[in-house]
Every structure is written in C-alpha cells, then in structure tokens.
Amino acid sequence: MKCFAQIVVLLLVIAFSHGAVITGVCDRDAQCGSGTCCAASAFSRNVRFCVPLGNNGEECHPASHKVPYNGKRLSSLCPCNTGLTCSKSGEKFQCS
C-alpha cells in the first residue's frame, strides 16, 4: 500500500510539474508513440514514462541512446528531436 501511495504522489508531482508531459507508463521505446521515448523517472529509475523527444533549447543527456532503443533507459531525458544535436551550452547540455 505504501508503494502504491508513493507512485500516486509521484505521478501527481510529474503531471503538475512545469513542462512535464505524461503519455503513459512504459518499459521500452516501442511502447511509446512517435516523437517520444521511454525515459526513466527523475525520482526512480524503476519507473519509466513516455516523454517527448527534446526540442531546440531543451535540456538533453549527451549519452542518450537513439530512438528506438531496445534496452531500458537510465536517463530521465529523451534524445533530441530529428535534426537536433545534444551539445554543451554553459553548464548544461541542450538540444540545438
């Protein structure tokens, strides 16, 4: 019951966070729609959600696997959208 309550709270926090889009719980990219990947939750790597690929100016992870990736992603960030690359911008990496 405690685990269920934690998951509900996690989903609510993510749903109402600025810029977060939840399209569904997943295990692999193949379970997500076009333009999304199955990324690990920022709170627990055991929970994954279908989230949009990175757009211009959005934060990214330089080692993120291309889409579709058959394994389980460890990052909470998807790769950049088609035509964009993940490059260092100041202290962060951003899609550009």
UniProtKB/Swiss-Prot annotation:
Residues annotated as signal peptide: 1-19
Keywords: Disulfide bond, G-protein coupled receptor impairing toxin, Secreted, Signal, Toxin
Keyword Magnesium: no
A molecular-function term among this protein's GO annotations: toxin activity
Tissue/organ expression: Expressed by the skin glands.
Top-level taxon: Eukaryota
Family listed: Belongs to the AVIT (prokineticin) family.
Full protein name: Prokineticin Bm8-c
Organism of provenance: Bombina maxima (Giant fire-bellied toad)
